[in-house]
């Protein structure tokens, strides 16, 4: 799964570039991918000591409302909230893409994981073949939010909808992510590929999903 995260400021903000957020408060949903994406975008635009963040609600709608009330200078949103923010006049000062992921415990068999991989692969192919059709799911998923219900599929920027078929986790990417998070105090200990990635189950599952004999 590929996720688009956008660093968003209110319509009245004087900030137009991520560099201008140095020493200004950015609200992040700590513990989620959007928060890490936010730190990455800020880190690339200023010295680490200038990155200023605070914990914010996990509810994207409430976070956007707080941004519009002026409670902080910026936050990071995903779709459909990026589109809602743009409709409200907000500006995107930076965007990035990152891998969403899932965690399987030891009880998940290669067969179950293979079924999951097949289902996700089929979904990715269908959505990539007609993204405009499937962005309507963003609207369907928030039946009680008037702003989202007012959106039409044509309102979405399809360039922000990116999907990739699932595959084995590249060790160098997993190592980099771990070490980067550790450098921010978000992880402790050294990266251990054998402890973090069950290659035996992963390999068997992907072979089963692809119909390759074991």
What are these regions (language model features)?
Residues 1-57, 73-76, 94-96:
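Short, glycine-/small- and polar/acidic-enriched structural segments
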Residues 41, 84, 180-181:
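Residues within well-ordered alpha helices
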Residues 47, 90-91, 186:
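Short aromatic/hydrophobic-glycine micro-motifs
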Residues 59-142:
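Pocket-lining segment of extracytoplasmic ligand-binding domains
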Residues 110-188:
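Secondary-structure end/capping motifs
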Residues 182-214:
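Conserved C-terminal helix/tail region of periplasmic/extracytoplasmic solute-binding proteins
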């Amino acid at each position: 799964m590929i996720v688009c995260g956008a660093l968003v400021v209110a319509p009245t903000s004087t900030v137009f570039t991520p560099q201008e957020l140095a020493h200004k408060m950015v609200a992040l949903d700590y513990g989620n991918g959007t928060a890490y994406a936010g730190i990455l975008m800020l880190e690339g635009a200023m010295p680490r000591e200038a990155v200023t963040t605070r914990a914010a609600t996990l509810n994207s709608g409430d976070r956007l409302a707080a941004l519009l009330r002026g409670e902080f200078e910026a936050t990071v949103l995903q779709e459909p909230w990026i589109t809602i923010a743009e409709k409200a006049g907000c500006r995107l000062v930076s965007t990035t893409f990152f891998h969403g992921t899932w965690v399987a415990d030891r009880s998940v068999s290669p067969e179950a994981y293979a079924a999951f991989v097949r289902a996700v692969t089929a979904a990715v192919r269908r959505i990539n073949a007609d993204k405009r059709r499937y962005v309507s799911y963003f609207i369907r998923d928030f039946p009680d939010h008037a702003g989202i219900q007012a959106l039409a599929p044509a309102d979405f920027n399809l360039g922000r909808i990116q999907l990739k078929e699932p595959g084995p986790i590249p060790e160098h990417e997993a190592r980099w992510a771990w070490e980067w998070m550790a450098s921010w105090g978000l992880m402790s200990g050294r990266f251990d590929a054998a402890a973090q990635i069950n290659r035996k189950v992963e390999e068997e599952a992907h072979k089963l999903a692809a119909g390759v004999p074991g």
